[in-house]
């Protein structure tokens, strides 16, 4: 509804023993068992079979780097949606450092002709569209373990997202995000900001 996600059910299933340590999977069997318990409980209550999912990830292996990039306006000096798309597509082709995978690429701002900063450049006039992107990286092994844990219980991972960003999206207003309000998510083994 209106592009918003509506939570219809939830289930908590703790990972037993040393299956997870500080947000990282150490024992795939224990984590898979916990995922299966939660998914089966929800499936039974809702009368559905869950076969695919988006999964959240956190841990000490997560880091971010800033990467500037720019493109030139495609037509007549007006920035169009296709220019923004081209800028984003160019960033998707940036290779991850060895041993890491890109989890998310987030534009921090847009700048038109090295002068005007804007949240939405579409419809502005200029020849050059630039942005600084925040690239969220995670350790390949940690990411692969999460994907393996899902696949072991016949769940296709549709994508991964950073837990800290999901928490912020869930509780902060656009104004609070613009003002730089931080969300501190204190968990059993990790604290995400």
Regions found by a protein language model. Name each.
Residues 1-183:
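Nucleotide/phosphate-binding catalytic cleft detector across ATP-hydrolyzing
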Residues 1, 191-193:
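Short beta-strand scaffold segments in enzyme catalytic cores
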Residues 186-188:
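A generic beta-sheet turn/junction motif
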């Amino acid at each position: 509804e209106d592009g918003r996600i509506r939570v219809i059910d939830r289930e908590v299933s703790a990972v037993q023993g040393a299956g997870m340590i500080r947000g990282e999977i150490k024992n795939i069997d224990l984590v898979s068992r916990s995922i299966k318990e939660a998914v089966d409980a929800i499936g039974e209550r809702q009368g559905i079979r869950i076969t695919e999912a988006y999964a959240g990830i956190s841990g000490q292996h997560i880091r971010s780097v800033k990467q500037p990039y720019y493109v030139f306006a495609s037509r007549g000096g007006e920035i169009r949606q296709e220019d923004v798309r081209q800028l984003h597509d160019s960033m998707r082709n940036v290779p991850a450092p060895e041993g890491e995978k890109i989890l998310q690429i987030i534009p921090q701002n847009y700048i038109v002709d090295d002068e005007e900063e804007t949240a939405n450049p579409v419809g502005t006039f200029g020849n050059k569209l630039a942005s600084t992107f925040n690239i969220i990286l995670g350790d390949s092994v940690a990411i692969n373990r999460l994907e393996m844990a899902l696949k072991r219980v016949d769940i296709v991972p549709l994508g991964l997202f950073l837990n800290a960003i999901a928490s912020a999206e869930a509780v902060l207003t656009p104004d609070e995000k613009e003002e730089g309000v931080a969300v501190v998510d204190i968990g059993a083994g990790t604290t995400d900001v």
